[in-house]
């Protein structure tokens, strides 16, 4: 047992070293700036783009300086959701496609989305048309910068896959690193703005309220993430001394923080598309109205965000907890739930529980990170606060997931004598 513990510690240390190397490469990429971009104009463009700023931070991107990894994992995350939707359409029969080809299809979709996003961003800023010998015109410069941004996004997908194989946390580590880097900067900017605009008693009280709210939200997120519905399981092959420890745990919020990341990414995608179209059709009234109405500070944009968030909260619950697989595993191991027949009845029972819990989780997400955005329609400052609440939930969930993965690795192969010989 002692030798197994040492091996587990060595495994965790090895994976942590790989993750450290991958994060180091990620940080280098964030500091490789794309030439020919007007940084001041980019900052002005991002100034009122609250959702874009938050999305950029929660996908590992860095638009503030237009670096190699400016797009982050946003295109890949959007492609993953779109592919998941396509697999639900039975006519396409995409579930039978091999994993290798599925990955290539998702990469292709991510590249298309990446080009749309890069063009949408570049079209709002001035660029130097002579950034290289291959780009002597405005169009050539845009194409070159777009290619660099998309290449960085694809490399980031590969980097996250390497961390999934060799390190700890997969792509979540890169997103976590990005959020940790961005947070001190955003907090310091907020404090400086208040100091410059005369730091009075009201500003001090507001900052104290914000700090207390952040602490409360962190504690609430931890409690919700750790809360479980435990379904007792009878295990025929397990020693009766351990019977009371046999249960199927299902989180109260089965989807975790993933719906927040993906809902933000999906909501910003139509904005990118309209921004790109607006570049080619600058005087089109429909495009301008669309851009104005789907903003996160408008009723339509907020409502769309809440609907997407609610739907993804239920969808991700069934991705994280597969009732079909659980029912099959229980039946194969001769285990069963009290008063529930093995097989289809068990699957339906677990499906019902997951749906109920996911509905509760969806309401929780909507109330904490969705409905407060309606206050931003009155005052845009509240939009920033509401989106920050969502990013806190994401941050806490990412940290919890990484800690759980490390615990699982440390206790790997540590089994008690549960089974009869």
Swiss-Prot record:
- What is the stated purpose of this protein? Part of the accessory SecA2/SecY2 system specifically required for export of possible cell wall proteins. The central subunit of a protein translocation channel.
Q: Which UniProt keywords apply?
A: Cell membrane, Membrane, Protein transport, Translocation, Transmembrane, Transmembrane helix, Transport
Superkingdom assignment: Bacteria
Please state which protein family the record places this protein in. Answer: Belongs to the SecY/SEC61-alpha family. SecY2 subfamily.
Task: State the InterPro entries in the record.
Answer: SecY/SEC61-alpha, SecY2, SecY_dom_sf
Q: How does it assemble?
A: Component of the accessory SecA2/SecY2 protein translocase complex required to export cell wall proteins. May form heterotrimers with SecE and SecG subunits.
Q: What is the organism field in this record?
A: Leuconostoc gelidum subsp. gasicomitatum (strain DSM 15947 / CCUG 46042 / CECT 5767 / JCM 12535 / LMG 18811 / NBRC 113245 / TB1-10)
> What protein name does the entry list?
Accessory Sec system protein translocase subunit SecY2
A single BP term in Gene Ontology: intracellular protein transmembrane transport
| Compartments where found | Cell membrane
CC per GO annotation: plasma membrane
Show the NCBIfam families listed in the entry: acc_sec_Y2, PRK12417.1
Note the topology in the membrane. Answer: Multi-pass membrane protein
Q: Which residues cross the membrane?
A: 17-37, 69-89, 102-122, 139-159, 165-185, 204-224, 254-274, 299-319, 358-378, 383-403
